[in-house]
Structures are given as C-alpha cells and as structure tokens.
Amino acid sequence: HQLKCLRLPRLLAQWDEDLKAAAQQRFSHARLLTHVVEHEYRQRCENARQQRLRRARIPEPWVLETYPFSRQPKLNKKAIQALYDSSSYLTQNQNIIWLGPTGIGKTGLATSFLTHAIHQGKSGRYILFAQLIAELYQAIADHTQAKVLKHYLSYDVLQIDELGYAEVEPAQVGLFFTLMQQRHKKKPTL
C-alpha cells in the first residue's frame, strides 16, 4: 500500500474515517488535505514526544502539577512554579541543583523539570551519578572518552540523580568535570 510505503501510519489507519468525515462535512479537496496533514502531524509529534520520554529513561515520570508541595512547606512553590512555567532554565541554559536530605523530593522536582523539557520538544536523559561515573570509568579503560562525552553532551537536558552518593576515583572526577564544563551555559543540567 502506498501510504505504508510513504510512512503515513495514521493516515493509513484513519483513511476511511477521514473520507467519511469529509463527505459528511462537505470538505473541499484543500480542506480534506489540510485535515489529513494536520492529524498526521499531530500524531507524529505525539509519537516523537513518547519516543523522547522512553529514551530519557526516567524511572518514574513526575510532573510539577502533582508534586506534593504540602509535604515540603519550606519550598518556595511560587519561585519553583515560575521557573518551571517560564522555561527560562531551558532558554538561558541554566543548571538547577536540588540540595537537601534524602526523601524530600529532589528527584521528583528534577524529574518534573526534565519531563517538562521533553514535552517542549527537547531531548533529555536521566541517569544516576553512580551509573554515569561507571560509564566514564569504562570509557577511560576503553579509550572512548570522546565518544561518551559527545553522547552526554548531545542531550538538551541532562538529569544526574544522587550526586555525591558514590565514591569516585580522581580520573573519573576529571572526566565528570570535563562533561560539566562543556555543558555549562550551553545546555541545562539538573
């Protein structure tokens, strides 16, 4: 089928319904074409968003709208909401560091910002600090540092969770510092 060959899956699945709607609403040819293209475009955007979410490897998707601010009364909800809503951390390539003891919701907040960026069309990645350090250490052993750095530099937003909970070798610190230095003021890191 030509639509399958052209990679128009939504159109292939909905063609009969689109024609029926066009007949009922007396669409012109131009209106039918506009209708079909708009729906295909929306479906592709949604598919791309879902794919970016999968690739980000977020263990538990959070959104700020469901974050339990009532459990953390010391948090400045208005400031956090303003930063989130304005997306200035994305447009100004700002890093956000969440500090505090275990269990107060740092991961949830950071993940909500990463998810928000992905919904806005950005690529992103969630990774535990220990996992990142292990990959960097392996890259040193394999002499693939440039490739690994390029990989993590490619993400529009990078969320590094549980920073400081793992012991680190001096060589690993150096490569981690290089990664952070190269991302600084170019792409946000959470």
Description of each model-found segment:
Residues 8-60:
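Interdomain "pre-motor" coupling segment immediately N-terminal to P-loop NTPase/helicase cores
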Residues 44-99:
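Extended interfacial segments that mediate partner engagement and assembly in macromolecular machines
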Residues 75-154:
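Conserved P-loop
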Residues 151-168:
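Conserved P-loop NTPase "ATPase switch" module shared by AAA+ and STAND
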Residues 164-188:
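Conserved catalytic/switch belt of AAA+ P-loop NTPases
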